[in-house]
Amino acid sequence: MKSYHQKFVSDHPYESSPMAEIAGFPVRPGIYDLNGATPLQNGVNFTIHTCGGTSCELLLFHRAQEEPFAVLPFPEAYKIGDVYSMIVYGLNIDEFEYAYRVDGPYCPEKGLLFDKNKILLDPYAKAVAGQRTWGIRWDHTYHARVVKDRFDWGDMPQSKKELCDLIIYELHVRDFTHHPS
C-alpha cells in the first residue's frame, strides 16, 4: 500500500525526468505544494517558503558533518511567489542531511532578518540531526533529514474538515516525557 503522499507524488506529472544540472546534480522545478523534503521515486522534492527572500540555496551535508558537500542555488525559475521548490535526483536519503541559506532584506523593524551566511533548519523538517547528547548546549547548526512516510492510509479518504473546525493541541514533548511516569 502507498501512503497518501507516495500516491500523490507518483501520480504527479512533475515526478519524471531532470531538466537541468546544478552543482553536478540533475534537477527540475519541484512540486510547490509539498512543504519540506519529500522523497520521490527517483529523487527528493525540496520546498521552502521564504516570506520575502530574494535567493535561496539548498545545502547538502554528509551525515554528522559541519561543511556541505554540495550547495545548490535555486534558479529564479524554480520560485513562485515566496516559495522555492526543486526536485534533486540521485540522492540516497540515508546518506545525507540538508539545510538552507536564504538571502533577502535585513530590516528588524519590519521583522526581516535575512542573513545569507546563516545556515537555516527547514521549518518543515520531519527529522532533525545534530545534537548527539540530549540537554547539552549545542554550538553547531542543526540539519534536517529526509524521512519516508511509512503510514499506510489504505483506502481512507483525505479529511474534508475545514481548518476553522480543527482543534490543534501543541505539546512540549520534553516536559511531557521527562518524568519516568
Mark where each language-model region is:
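Residue-level signature of catalytic and energy-coupling elements of molecular machines
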Residues: I48, L171
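Structural beta-strand segments of beta-rich domains
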Residues: N42-F46
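Short proline/glycine-enriched turn/loop motifs at strand-loop junctions of beta-rich domains
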Residues: H49-S55
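The feature marks proteins involved in alpha-glucan
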Residues: K2-Q41, P68-V71, Y78-M86, G90-E170, ...
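Beta-strand signatures of extracellular beta-sandwich domains
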Residues: E57-L59, A99
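Structured catalytic/translocation cores of nucleotide/phosphate-coupled proteins
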Residues: G30, L60-F61
